[in-house]
Amino acid sequence: MYLYIETLKQRLDAINQLRVDRALAAMGPAFQQVYSLLPTLLHYHHPLMPGYLDGNVPKGICLYTPDETQRHYLNELELYRGMSVQDPPKGELPITGVYTMGSTSSVGQSCSSDLDIWVCHQSWLDSEERQLLQRKCSLLESWAASLGVEVSFFLIDENRFRHNESGSLGGEDCGSTQHILLLDEFYRTAVRLAGKRILWNMVPCDEEEHYDDYVMTLYAQGVLTPNEWLDLGGLSSLSAEEYFGASLWQLYKSIDSPYKAVLKTLLLEAYSWEYPNPRLLAKDIKQRLHDGEIVSFGLDPYCMMLERVTEYLTAIEDFTRLDLVRRCFYLKVCEKLSRERACVGWRRAVLSQLVSEWGWDEARLAMLDNRANWKIDQVREAHNELLDAMMQSYRNLIRFARRNNLSVSASPQDIGVLTRKLYAAFEALPGKVTLVNPQISPDLSEPNLTFIYVPPGRANRSGWYLYNRAPNIESIISHQPLEYNRYLNKLVAWAWFNGLLTSRTRLYIKGNGIVDLPKLQEMVADVSHHFPLRLPAPTPKALYSPCEIRHLAIIVNLEYDPTAAFRNQVVHFDFRKLDVFSFGENQNCLVGSVDLLYRNSWNEVRTLHFNGEQSMIEALKTILGKMHQDAAPPDSVEVFCYSQHLRGLIRTRVQQLVSECIELRLSSTRQETGRFKALRVSGQTWGLFFERLNVSVQKLENAIEFYGAISHNKLHGLSVQVETNHVKLPAVVDGFASEGIIQFFFEETQDENGFNIYILDESNRVEVYHHCEGSKEELVRDVSRFYSSSHDRFTYGSSFINFNLPQFYQIVKVDGREQVIPFRTKSIGNMPPANQDHDTPLLQQYFS
């Protein structure tokens, strides 16, 4: 036994050193410096070292001895800066070990890869010590960033996985959605920079079910010494709950980094295919380590992942996705084989061998190596292919869950965050701008763009067509348009937000008298100045909250301009009484069309179009309906006006009206009932009534009707009935009301006799239930199951998706004030049994 253990330790150390050497070989000088010095900076704590802060900061890594590079750094500090290096006290030190995980040291590591560092610490650190260590790690992240290196630290309590603790969504630890799978990835990819060896590697795979007993036997026999090993626990069986949560998390990540996520998503799918006895990849690697089979390029975890996914896709004869996953792997490795290199490193040798086995020709290599120059056609094809592959994975996951009648373990809050991002990215709506380039190609800019308008009555459908070429008849006729929409605003937005339209693009337009080139150029300039292309990704808090308008542009008279009729005419009006909404003797409205372009807090870009005399009223009602009363005001609201005449007056008046209405909608005096705005448009009076849950519009024909409407709103303040006796909603519920989603608010009763429930549907209609008894968790489960039968779906290509899950909140009192917080529970509950007749479309069971 002793000899066997010593042999294993030697193999472990050899593999670890191989990975360290490979990691350093793939790094630039700054990366190497950060990678090499991190253990030293965590072991010591001194004002002359990066990461220093005042306080009793935990320092010291168990079993740490500086290597030559680290000793040289310490000697320089001591020699040239007078630093006296003091070793931490003897005994068990606070930091158990420092490990990289992920692609670092694998064939998937590139010069642009970031570093994910696990700092494993003793469970006896108190809350203050953990906070200080976290602050030090944040300072070290900033120091690394100053050198151009992206590092992310994750503090890991050595007992975390034994107690099934979870972090928060938004970091690499994936909130409550992963546990065993996160440990699986750590065990197969970890590289020890300093500290204790990982105990799990010493336990044979056939003893995994008796992991703790086997470890205690090794300790009792004196074969291993407990304080020399990091023990995060064994890899128990994979629960369906965790599997589903991890799969959602991978889809979440795939939105921003599709090539990177495809391989991991398919690995999870392979696990489900092997259920109920999935061969976790970490166990496979460990088995080969124990057998002495140092294969697959030195047990490279990235190559092993590709090998497992290849086995699975070949077994189910899915060669389309197999080809895709190989291309994703090739692009992730980022070794351009079509270009000669003087030095052939190990990563290039690995990729060359694989490409030869796949039978790829030079043309395919050249196409992939030219990814930096891909334009819209190639990018859109790649985007659709990646999306189809992801959707296929999730259809398979849903079938797997239904077949096994398994449940969903992610908390409602995490599910809400995940599904909101999916909803924002994949929901297809007529006015929504689809972003097709999530890190696929760095530059989609086009030198020429032509916008062509086809009027009604022609062979082609009426509307606007976009081409990425100059308006040469032969080239236009022989090519399909890039995009079509009934309205110009949507096409300009699509071209701008997808990066085709830049300041260097030459614009052409054939507008048939609707829009000319100067007007188009002016609009493009306004949009580009008002809407930045890149913004930080929405936070989990933003995704869990109702979406709010962040940047809003109101585009007036772009496609229809009533003032164009003034040309060569004498128009009589009193300048002192000028009203652009009821202008002149005929009381014409000078706003003929309104286009809305806005970006919301989920980073969706939406467009809407309104035509005719009532376009201003309709646009106002739409804007205000998308603002719940507790929403923050938009960061910016701009009015762009393209009228031939009276442009400044129209723009100013619209700006004033919009600002006044937004102020009324979001006003802190929301408890006052009967707030309204009267507006005269084309000689008719309209009333905008700012009610508790929405904004209604009513045409007021005469004085009696006008005052009657005002009186009604003063009396009731609601356009809907709450129960039969007009029960008043709590103010915090009013403020959180948001159209388009179903919201449940739980409130504890003052006499502790059950709880109250306030339910707002997509149109903010209200139901109230008092003194409810029973389990809130069961209610959440039942509601989720109920909405899984909804038929409201949206489509993306051939895929049906519905991510609009009801949202659950708890009303609490903090310092005497009512607040709304997300409702948290451990489980949504069991899924309904499988329907054997039909496969439910993607995520339909969970997110209907």
Curated annotation (Swiss-Prot):
Localisation: Cytoplasm
Ranges where the record places region Catalytic: 1-535
Modified residues (Phosphohistidine): H609
Disulphide-bonded residues: none
GO cellular component terms, semicolon-separated: cytoplasm
Entry EC number(s): 4.6.1.1
Transmembrane segments: none
The keyword Lyase appears for this protein: yes
GO molecular function terms noted in the UniProt entry: adenylate cyclase activity; ATP binding
Protein name per the record: Adenylate cyclase
UniProt organism field: Escherichia coli O157:H7
GN (gene name): cyaA
